[in-house]
């Protein structure tokens, strides 16, 4: 699901809100989440999951085109850990 599909679906389910209002709320929520992670803080949405930063240590990588070794710096990357309710709902899906 893309962001625009999410906005469309929420606007349909919440008839009292316009698509523009839903779009604004989604954009503001995502911006706030990004700002919180930028500040090094953790985000927890009970039943859904938590977002945090994990440190990825420096390592030697490989350029896929040339095959040459490349030194990669250490960096922080976003990490999502699903909550218990979300895990249970996904586990119940029969694919």
Swiss-Prot record:
Organism domain of life: Bacteria
GO cellular component: chromosome; cytosol
Molecular function via GO: DNA binding; structural constituent of chromatin
Keywords: DNA recombination, DNA-binding, Transcription, Transcription regulation, Translation regulation
Transmembrane stretches, start-end: none
CDD domains named in the record: IHF_B (cd13836)
Region Disordered: start-end pairs: 56-76
GO biological process, one term: regulation of translation
SUPFAM superfamilies hit by this protein: IHF-like DNA-binding proteins
Job of this protein: This protein is one of the two subunits of integration host factor, a specific DNA-binding protein that functions in genetic recombination as well as in transcriptional and translational control.
Subunit structure of this chain's protein: Heterodimer of an alpha and a beta chain.
Listed HAMAP family: IHF_beta
Name of the protein: Integration host factor subunit beta
The organism's taxonomic lineage, starting at the top: Bacteria, Pseudomonadati, Pseudomonadota, Gammaproteobacteria, Alteromonadales
């Amino acid at each position: 699901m893309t962001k625009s599909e999410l906005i469309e679906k929420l606007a349909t389910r919440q008839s009292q809100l316009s698509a523009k209002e839903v779009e604004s709320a989604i954009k503001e929520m995502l911006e706030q989440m990004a700002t919180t992670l930028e500040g090094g803080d953790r985000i927890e949405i009970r039943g859904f999951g938590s977002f945090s930063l994990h440190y990825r240590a420096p390592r030697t990588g490989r350029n896929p085109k040339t095959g040459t070794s490349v030194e990669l710096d250490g960096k922080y990357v976003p990490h999502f850990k699903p909550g218990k309710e979300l895990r249970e709902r996904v586990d119940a899906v029969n694919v």
